[in-house]
Amino acid sequence: MVERVILIVLDSVGAGEMPDADKYGDKGSDTIGNISKAVGGLKLPDMVKMGLGNISGIKGVDKVQYPIGAFGKLKEMSKGKDTVTGHWEMSGVILEEPLNTYPNGFPKDIIDEFEKKIGRKVIGNKVASGTEIIKELGDEHIKTGCPIVYTSADSVFQVAAHEEIIPLDELYKICKVAREMLVDDRTVGRVIARPFVGKNSNYTRTSNRRDFALDPFNKTMLEYIKENKSNVMCVGKIEDIFNKKGVTEAVHIKNNMDGVDKTLEYMKTDKKGLIFTNLVDFDMLYGHRNDPKGYAKALEEFDGRINEIKTNMKDYDVLMITADHGCDPTTESTDHSREYIPFIAYGKDIKGGADIKIRDSFSDIGKTILDLLQVENNLVGKSFKDIIMK
């Protein structure tokens, strides 16, 4: 009997363009396949053994005759291609309308109100890469003390500040002000604190980022599990994505490997329920920066930890590895891409070689997890428990 699911989201590790990718400017995007082509092949032996290369239409990864895990891929039903939309959908919340984006920066009324409430002028207010904007405006920020506000193709309001100019506590308070403002017809998916350090135009972002999300619009997989008196243990930015709704405990992480370490720490306890992990380096450090070599290395590093994860699994555990969207580092765009997400599952009770094929919605993951944990629910989605269980 399954009593715990370990769900690991490899942030942005897409498995090829979705049929509507052209509507999002993402025709030809294929995060895994194009990275593999760019670096002369990916070496992911443990995910390959589980069936990664057996997923229908996946490119650049070896197929095996007898996978030890279940495998497949899922379509995004929601309108959008960002972190919040992807994680919410896999947890049972489908967005009929995309969250607001601000391709020309934020309107004057929003900025004026924000400046008044925080007692500081802001600089920036445009679409920008986070690493580029601190290079461009970091010196001015240090001279003036004005926080840097910027956005991207996603539904985000980002505030960058030097940790010695605006201390972390104050930066987080500033972001909470923005979060309270950006609702209703101004809604953004996330307000993100982006602290950095350094001097003289040589700045680097720190791992003290914080995401301030919205409450999910409907009840999620997490809330159903928590209400069932079970544990929802979140690693990385998961608790921020769900605005703590349905979370019983959480830990933030410094990088992917720290995320694996923290996941293992939860696995070594006897706590039943869900361990929900997001590993963001793929997206943040390599996808958005169009660095296929760095991305490939990060994938190979993660694959190198899978044996350790498997060794620490209990008989009642099921491991699931998936993604939330794409972010193909080989295309001109530095933004997310509208892609299928891969899915592999492993455990004592999982049928090796089980193919879930192409599912109609990420929400099938959440529905299946609740089914495995025997939690009654009204979640959208279709469970594939019967396909993957022995």
Curated annotation (Swiss-Prot):
Reply yes or no: does the keyword Isomerase apply. Answer: yes
Q: What is its EC number?
A: 5.4.2.7
Residues binding Mn(2+) 1 are 11, 324-325
**Which keywords belong to this entry?**
Cytoplasm, Isomerase, Manganese, Metal-binding
Supply the InterPro entries for this chain. Answer: Alkaline_phosphatase_core_sf, DeoB, Metalloenzyme, Phosphopentomutase_DeoB_cap_sf
Q: Pfam families given for it? A: Metalloenzyme
GO CC annotation terms, alphabetical: cytosol
Instruction: Write out the GO MF terms.
Output: magnesium ion binding; manganese ion binding; phosphopentomutase activity
Where does this protein hold Mn(2+) 2?
Answer: 283, 288, 336
Localisation:
Cytoplasm
Record-level GO BP terms: 2-deoxyribose 1-phosphate catabolic process; 5-phosphoribose 1-diphosphate biosynthetic process; metabolic compound salvage; nucleotide metabolic process
Q: Which pathway is this protein assigned to?
A: Carbohydrate degradation; 2-deoxy-D-ribose 1-phosphate degradation; D-glyceraldehyde 3-phosphate and acetaldehyde from 2-deoxy-alpha-D-ribose 1-phosphate: step 1/2
Note on how the cofactor is bound: Binds 2 manganese ions.
Catalytic activity field = 2-deoxy-alpha-D-ribose 1-phosphate = 2-deoxy-D-ribose 5-phosphate; alpha-D-ribose 1-phosphate = D-ribose 5-phosphate
Q: Which CDD domains match?
A: PPM (cd16009)
Q: Main role? A: Isomerase that catalyzes the conversion of deoxy-ribose 1-phosphate (dRib-1-P) and ribose 1-phosphate (Rib-1-P) to deoxy-ribose 5-phosphate (dRib-5-P) and ribose 5-phosphate (Rib-5-P), respectively.
Which family is this protein grouped under?
Answer: Belongs to the phosphopentomutase family.
Protein name in UniProt = Phosphopentomutase
